[in-house]
């Protein structure tokens, strides 16, 4: 009996440590993603993206933090907060010095959705048009229109950030049960939103993060016909990416992604 209790105690202790192991890595990834060191942030982003839906609650929580943590060691990275431009390098259309926008960047890359975070850095004369196109429910309200007309460009940027965060939170409130990245990829390719289509196509071509269930068989059965259709559209960014996927008959784009 004594031996039984000892074994039971050790099993419980082991379960506690296993549970701690599962929680601790994500918290460490979150901490790294909030870092000011760009290589650390980029590495954490990829690892968090590999966890799929498991990181989304943390990303939504990060959107409550809109402080600026200016990135360092960015090299030739091209993004709105960059202080030097080298004429080449990775391009990111998000002001990722801003923590809540950084969370939105990862969430949009993970889900292939367009919540609006990339519109914050647009030229002053494009901000109102972006609001009308991406947040029509807000824009078409007369009192909101009056308020919008009184805003400076800085105020419009703050408004876009606020509306993007609200859109992301509302989406997750309704989508959290049963969401998975594979279905999201399929939906984005079928979307009428060019940005969603391009994100999904770019992921297929160049993405190195996990999408559970994405296999050659799944592609041929569910995605290939969509890609062929997108290759014929007039939007250059969409058709060019789709054509390049079709040309990759060896499925090299699939081999660079983690295996399930």
Regions found by a protein language model. Give the residues of each.
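Positively charged n-region of N-terminal signal peptides that target proteins for export
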Residues: 1-4
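Bacterial N-terminal signal peptides
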Residues: 7-15
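Extended repeat-based scaffolds of very large eukaryotic assembly and lipid-transport proteins
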Residues: 20-260
